Swiss-Prot record:
<keyword id="KW-0436">Ligase</keyword>
<feature type="binding site">
    <location>
        <position position="172"/>
    </location>
    <ligand>
        <name>L-aspartate</name>
    </ligand>
</feature>
<dbReference type="Pfam" id="PF02938">
    <property type="entry name" value="GAD"/>
</dbReference>
<feature type="region of interest" description="Aspartate">
    <location>
        <begin position="196"/>
        <end position="199"/>
    </location>
</feature>
<keyword id="KW-0067">ATP-binding</keyword>
<dbReference type="InterPro" id="IPR006195">
    <property type="entry name" value="aa-tRNA-synth_II"/>
</dbReference>
<comment type="similarity">
    <text>Belongs to the class-II aminoacyl-tRNA synthetase family. Type 1 subfamily.</text>
</comment>
<dbReference type="GO" id="GO:0006422">
    <property type="term" value="P:aspartyl-tRNA aminoacylation"/>
</dbReference>
<dbReference type="InterPro" id="IPR004364">
    <property type="entry name" value="Aa-tRNA-synt_II"/>
</dbReference>
<dbReference type="InterPro" id="IPR004115">
    <property type="entry name" value="GAD-like_sf"/>
</dbReference>
<feature type="binding site">
    <location>
        <position position="494"/>
    </location>
    <ligand>
        <name>L-aspartate</name>
    </ligand>
</feature>
<dbReference type="InterPro" id="IPR004524">
    <property type="entry name" value="Asp-tRNA-ligase_1"/>
</dbReference>
<dbReference type="InterPro" id="IPR002312">
    <property type="entry name" value="Asp/Asn-tRNA-synth_IIb"/>
</dbReference>
<keyword id="KW-0963">Cytoplasm</keyword>
<keyword id="KW-0030">Aminoacyl-tRNA synthetase</keyword>
<dbReference type="GO" id="GO:0004815">
    <property type="term" value="F:aspartate-tRNA ligase activity"/>
</dbReference>
<feature type="binding site">
    <location>
        <position position="453"/>
    </location>
    <ligand>
        <name>L-aspartate</name>
    </ligand>
</feature>
Length: 574
């Protein structure tokens, strides 16, 4: 039905007859001349109906309206120089219509696809929202990413293997979506939260390099970067060290950024989990933000330096200094607003100081700020030297008297807010990093052990006896890839020993009966020569969100759910 896409026509097509199919984006009737912008997935082309060249076609064109779907045959010609539209890729040419047919008419649209619309209408009429050029670009970018994935994985010897969508209910960390069985009354399947167990079983089978692009399902509270169903680039290997996997995945991500954005990513920094939590207060820090934290708790954990706002019987005070480059510009009103904000995040107290050095001499300085009311000069000098503060900076010192709460997490929100408010973050740059050496376990609010990553993650340089002795001291062989504050990939070496996996299940409080009932087939597989294996999963939605500059993964999913897990277009669930 067509010989070319509208958005691909250029000067090389001048003089050629083309057949186009698409939707009328704009319609302009000047009597003897009618112009339409015809739109398809590749863009728009101006079409001219000239009464002096084809009177019958021009008269028929008067019936056309916006969003009619038509087929059109015409001749490509160059536009006069004074009529070239440099704002669009086809702006140097137009098509003179010879004939057309209306494939379908259109009612007036319930939303204006040339503008931004309210979120509810966009989701209700998603099939129309997707007609917007920006949405076409986002979905096409997503498709290009998937093509790169397949090409790279095949070149590296990975096999594309599908795993089941109907599987067993297992305690993987989030709630399952349950599918009742019609044939087996009273029994249920679960939609997979990830292909974790099955890809490990593939390693046991001998498929040493596996990948797939697959849907995963988690019934959890949603955020801007989460959906109840999401797409994962799932990868698993045998006989490969975690260092080698990270190197290979770095190459993979570099290729995606190069081909999609023509950007060469810089060095992938590497931090331990402990380092990023201490320095940035987050396990997914945005390294474009220059604000860094410094632990100065040791200066205040003595009776001599006890602060009036800290409980008298508390010697476990946490104190974190946070240097803000170019923060001297902040007014007292702004500072007060940040203090209020930090306390809303749970902080006990936030002090501040500005320092003006005379003639760049650090020994001659003028100090201004609330710290002078609480901190002596000697202690303050130690803090200033530790943070290497400059004249244009402001220094915040946050305090908390509850050692069971992480003060850096509280300050992380303030760090992010300051970075955005003061325009300290270079929005056009990329800051990739790896985070390694996560704790194997943590305790929840009930004092129970839970996995930091998942229950199949291998401990690092640790045997079963060491694991049992003090689980909270054990480091895992886990790693995350983070770019610009967004975790795009997470992986680990897996447990391939029956005894180690059983020990982990025991620590997590999974009874022997539940181990057999829920994981019996998997535990049996570990007895039959399971190889050392490791892997990683990337969030396709998050990668597409980053590469398109979108603020929400809904923008890169064709038919997403709302934050309440509702499809308001199809009215699901019902």
């Amino acid at each position: 039905m067509r010989t070319a896409y509208c958005g691909q026509l250029n000067l090389s097509h001048v003089g050629l007859e083309v057949t186009l199919c698409g939707w009328i984006n704009k319609y302009r009737n000047f009597g003897g001349l009618i112009f339409i912008d015809l739109r398809d997935r590749e863009g728009c082309i101006q079409v001219c109906f000239d009464v002096y060249q084809n009177k019958e076609v021009c008269i028929s064109a008067a019936k056309l309206k916006q969003e009619f779907c038509i087929q059109l045959i015409g001749m490509v010609r160059a536009r006069p120089k004074n009529q070239i539209n440099s704002n669009i890729s086809t702006g140097a040419v137009e098509v003179v219509a010879k004939k057309f047919s209306i494939l379908n008419i259109s009612d007036p649209l319930p939303l204006d696809i040339s503008k931004n619309n309210i979120e509810e209408n966009r989701l209700k009429y998603r099939y129309l929202d997707l007609r917007r050029s920006i949405m076409f670009d986002r979905i096409k970018t997503r498709s290009r990413i998937m093509s790169i994935v397949h090409r790279f994985m095949e070149l590296e010897g990975f096999l594309n293997i599908e795993t089941p969508m109907l599987t067993k209910v297992t305690p993987e960390g989030s709630r399952d979506y349950i599918v009742p069985s019609r044939l087996h009354a009273g029994k249920n399947y679960a939609l997979p939260q990830s292909p974790q167990i099955f890809k490990q079983l593939l390693m046991v089978s001998g498929f040493d390099r596996y990948y797939q692009i697959t849907k995963c399902f988690r019934d959890e509270d949603l955020r801007a970067d989460r959906q109840p169903e999401f797409t994962q680039i799932d990868i698993e290997t045998s006989f490969m060290t975690t260092q080698k996997i990270r190197e290979l995945m770095e190459i993979f991500i570099r290729i995606i950024w190069r081909e999609i954005l023509n950007v060469e990513l810089g060095v992938f920094s590497q931090f331990t989990y402990s380092e990023v939590m201490q320095r940035f207060g987050s396990d997914a820090p945005d390294l474009r933000n220059p604000i860094e934290m410094f632990d100065v708790s040791y200066l205040f954990n003595s009776t001599q330096n006890r602060l009036s706002f800290i409980r008298a019987n508390n010697i476990g005070v946490q104190a974190i200094a946070m240097k803000v480059p170019n923060g001297r510009q902040l007014t007292q009103k702004q500072i007060d607003e940040y203090i209020y904000y930090s306390k809303q995040c749970g902080l006990k107290e936030l002090l501040w100081v500005k320092v003006q050095f005379s003639d760049n001499d650090i020994t001659k300085k003028e100090i201004q700020g609330s710290v002078t009311n609480f901190i002596d000069n000697l202690t303050l000098d130690i803090i200033l030297n530790k943070t290497n503060i400059k004249s244009n900076d402001i220094l915040f010192v946050g305090f908390n008297d509850n050692k069971n709460q992480f003060i850096t997490k509280m300050l992380s929100a303030l760090r992010l807010k300051l970075g955005n408010d003061l325009c300290l973050i270079k929005k056009d740059s990329w800051a990739p990093l790896w985070i390694i050496d996560f704790p194997m376990f943590k305790k929840n609010c009930h004092g129970e052990y839970t996995s930091m990553h998942h229950m199949f993650t291998s401990p690092k340089n640790c045997d079963v006896q060491m694991l049992k002795k003090d689980p909270l001291l054990v480091i895992s062989e886990a790693y995350d890839m983070v770019i610009n504050g967004c975790e795009i990939g997470s992986g680990s070496a897996r447990i391939h020993s029956f005894d180690m996996q059983q020990a982990v299940f025991n620590i997590l409080g999974i009874t022997q009966n539940d181990q057999k009932k829920k994981f019996g087939y998997f535990m049996d597989a570990l007895k039959y020569g399971a190889p050392p294996h490791a892997g990683l999963a990337f969030g396709l939605d998050r990668i597409a969100m980053l590469l398109t500059g979108s603020k929400n993964i809904r923008e890169v999913i064709a038919f997403p759910k709302t934050t309440a897990s509702v499809d308001i277009m199809a009215n699901a669930p019902d």
